[in-house]
Amino acid sequence: MYKITKGLDLPISGAPNQVIETAAAAKTVAVIGPDFHGMKPTMLVKEGDKVKKGQIIFTDKKTEGVNYTAPASGTVIEINRGERRVFQSLVIRVEGDESETFTSYSGSELKSLERSKVVDNLVNSGLWTSFRTRPFSKVPEIASVPNSIFVTAIDTNPLAASPEVVLADQAEAFADGLTVLTRLTEGKVFLCKASGAKIPTTSDVTVEEFSGVHPAGLAGTHIHFLDPVNDKKTVWSINYQDVVAIGKLFVTGELSVERVISVAGPQVKKPRLVRTQVGVSLNDLLAGELSEGDNRVISGSVLSGRKAFGPFAYLGRYHNQVSVLLEGRERQMMHYLRAGVEKHSIMNVFLSKLTGKKSFDMTTTTNGSDRTMLPLGNFERVMPLDILPTQLLRALVVNDTEQAQKLGALELDDEDLALCTYSCSGKFEYGPILRDCLTLIEKEG
């Protein structure tokens, strides 16, 4: 077991009740462009077209052969693009239940499937996009083979759903999905779970337990300790709910888009787990669920999710939670003289440290303006990986890609630096800075 002692469990209020309720059927769903790093679509549908669930709606120009499929049947009502025609989202109004069918197999056949058949089924159904590579956190190329595969069946993000609860009634499909994954690599399939958690498994996978504070549940943490990557070595990671979808695909021949997510945060009236689907409209899902005020809806974690608004107001492809905070637009008079009873600080400069307050109604305020990055030891407190965080972050900020590679940038994804962003007195957003650096490294070598 790996015990993570450096990090932070964010003390935010609005934790969800770990009981699953079924949400109303989705009215609109979407595929969001920025969820897929470096993807450039070739559209196969246009506004007004009817589509079936599982039908290919676009392919990736940059990664030949990768298909993106419709998460529901209905009518394409929007294809949103931003500046320079950058793809933002494709929105489908849900109508009917028509769906494509794919190749199915018996449970006994899964252990001996040829790799090519597994790849074909995943690509045709669009579930190939469930995988993300490390380095670069992109959808893998069709011909690529990973050194190992990591199944993330632990979630230490603030306000997250418990994988143990979500998988309680999905044991068979999850086990089938794990068996399918073993056909994709000659290396190990690591099942990473919380210490003592009752997660279904099979004899063909390697089970590893992690405990302690966030980021104990991130794929980047698991990869760092179990099978570190470099510029010549690639591994893949996949979320536990996508493993369930893969298991169902290969046994039933149908594309499962079900997703159990946490709807939580200080502004949610009834924080809980809901059963919905990939790409669901968050405007519809949260109707009547929020307290009054200027709220920010976040698809994903409060630490590393994205603001869900306009063409992006839908559940992200890789997100298992929706978080809602109050916009922190109001500034307190002479805030620097206040005791900070209602504020959290990792540097223990507020009185809240002495009062023993367990959770805080956090907002989006940064409590100050942009300033110089200061090496105060904060980054070392929240970074459990065997890297030099202050030096790495400095290299990222000045765009020194060569030094960043030497200091471990290739091991990281945006979410791995979220706690560094939270603890930075200079208010730097290290996730986007890392992403720009990784894009440049991939382009220039």
From Swiss-Prot:
It catalyses: a ubiquinone + n Na(+)(in) + NADH + H(+) = a ubiquinol + n Na(+)(out) + NAD(+). Its EC number is 7.2.1.1. Keywords: Ion transport, NAD, Sodium, Sodium transport, Translocase, Transport, Ubiquinone. InterPro entries: NqrA, NQRA_2nd, NqrA_C_domain, NQRA_N, Single_hybrid_motif. CDD domains: lipoyl_domain. It comes from the Bacteria. Pfam families: NQRA_2nd, NQRA_N, NQRA_SLBB. HAMAP family: NqrA. Composed of six subunits; NqrA, NqrB, NqrC, NqrD, NqrE and NqrF. Belongs to the NqrA family. This is Na(+)-translocating NADH-quinone reductase subunit A.
